[in-house]
Amino acid sequence: MTDIRTFLKTGEPLLFDGAMGTHFAALPGRAGERCELGSLRRPEEIAAIHRAYLEAGCRAVKTNTFTVSLDLARGDGETAERIVEASCRLARACAEPYGAYVFADIGPAPESRLLPRAENYCRQADLFLDRGIRHFLLETLPSDHGLRQLAQHLKARCPEAYLITSFAVSFDGATREGDFGQTLLRRSVALEEIDAVGFNCVSGPHHLLEYIRGLDTGGATLSVMPNAGYPTVQGRRTVFQGTPEYFGQKIAEIVQAGASIVGGCCGTTPAHIAGAAEALAKPRRVTAAASSGAAPEPRGSVSANTLAEKLDGGRRVVAVELDPPTD
């Protein structure tokens, strides 16, 4: 398999899979069941989800281990180790025929008297390294607490390891712990042990696209994995708005805005990743003006104001207010 650093130098975006929990919860009788335990109890279902994403066109899959941090935080190292063991085995077996990369998926660790965040992350890194995993995604982070220690520990044990750190920011750029994405990105870029940095979860593709357009990434390799959209509750089920086609279009725009690594978070399914793969396979669109050689319209040009025309003409106007957030 091509070294991941070599792959990224080709300029081709690395497309990750989407949400494991969303797909697992949609299976009959699985709503409310912890999907990480599925690696132990229902391995055939977890493997089927991995393969569905690979068939959709992703080039990297995450191990089914997002909440292992919680097991370690409450002192249940045995369950954590069993989940990591089974999840690594499943992800590797599924990814190998497709030539896809396998990333250790590490979710946010809670603050705990029993186990500080830094130690939690380092213990997880050891579990994955001991099983031959060399690619790591630390995702949905509300802060960078413990990040420096993890990055240094990881590279001390395995210098060739590849580490992506990804923060969860709302559309205004803040995390739930009050940190700002730009600050977290800047501090992460300053750590030479971190290979890529970015954002995932909380926000839909439109808002993450608009957010990264205003960022100074400092030349970092940028990773962006938005939610499918924003959740609503329909018949006791959480449903995310946004079609796979729309998601794919926005992922392509996110790549054009500078991201090298993309994928999906909450609410995304193999259909969303297929939409992204299809959109990324298309050549960049060329505007009609550019293709015809016509001069672009001056920025100062004035277009017709249909609202003003209706008001001036005494016609009735209907105003509609949409509840934020929208995507």
Name each model-derived stretch.
Residues 1-327:
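Domain-level signal for soluble alpha/beta catalytic cores
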